[in-house]
A protein has these predicted regions:
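Conserved active-site-proximal phosphate/metal-binding subdomains
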Residues: 151-161, 165, 171-245, 249-250
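Residue-level detector of alpha-helix initiation sites
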Residues: 22, 170-171
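Active-site entrance/lid segments in N-terminal catalytic domains of soluble metabolic enzymes
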Residues: 1-163
């Protein structure tokens, strides 16, 4: 089995998660320069800012980098074209089926790596010609599925023949080793990079993350079909109570 760094041309078998409103071109470049695959998170951008961030990333690194596209984004079609025009090396996708874009991306030489939360979705996507798949467990930050990383990864490995990348709750070398033992070729990490000097979030947010323990996150939005793992604070607790008391409210 080839490791992820051999597939992507990076130093380490690590992808930086494409976190919306956080993973800018500058942050992605820093991650690529450190030996991972930096990913620009297009989720909080429009078409113009995405293009600007791609070009800024290219100014700051000569290493491979990619773009994450959330397919429910209203400008997903434009994003799909921009990554071709800007000759991005890798596209990761979430929140939808990338099928209508895969042939265009592949023709442009782009590696296509969707994020999945279930083996059935991985099986559905493999015939489209994807290069790998990210199996993301419920331990991850942000939008989550229901299956744990430990349970999900080997099921996806058994379900598809393309390389599988583990994600969700991975923060150190022990968890990377565990992912490889489960059959993954590498890992995607996000939350553990938030406290880095290069990450553009507010220092108070970094301090809260560093202070947080194993019971300091909460998943909101399950009752409205949009589960999201966030830090516990007054707002997330209140939001969780609203979802429980008014489950059909959107």
């Amino acid at each position: 089995m080839k490791l992820l760094n051999e597939i992507l041309g990076t130093k380490y078998p690590i992808i930086q998660g494409g976190m919306a409103n956080i993973a800018t071109g500058e942050f992605a470049a820093a991650c690529s320069n450190a030996g991972a695959l930096g990913i620009i998170g297009a989720g909080g951008m429009n078409a113009d800012t995405l293009r600007q961030n791609i070009r800024r990333c290219r100014e700051l690194t000569d290493k491979p980098f990619g773009v994450n596209i959330m397919l429910m984004h209203p400008q997903a079609d434009e994003f799909a074209q921009i990554v071709v025009e800007e000759k991005v090396a890798v596209v990761t996708t979430g929140a939808g089926n990338p099928g209508k874009y895969v042939s265009m991306w592949k023709a442009a030489g782009i590696k296509v790596i969707p994020v999945v939360a279930a083996a059935v979705l991985a099986r559905h996507l493999e015939p489209l010609g994807i290069d790998a798949v990210i199996a993301e467990g419920t331990e991850s930050g942000g939008h989550v599925g229901e299956m744990t990383t430990m349970a999900l990864v080997p099921q996806v490995v058994d379900a598809v023949s393309v390389p599988v990348i583990a994600a969700g709750g991975i923060a150190d070398g022990r968890q990377l080793a565990a992912a490889l033992a489960l059959g993954a070729c590498g890992v995607q990490v996000g939350t553990c990079l938030l406290a880095s000097e290069e990450c553009p979030i507010h220092p108070n947010y970094k301090a809260a993350l560093l202070k947080a323990g194993d019971s300091d996150t909460i998943v909101t939005g399950r009752t409205v079909g949009a589960p999201v793992r966030v830090l516990k604070n007054r707002m997330s607790r209140e939001l969780s109570l609203i979802h429980i008391s008014e489950p059909t409210r959107r």
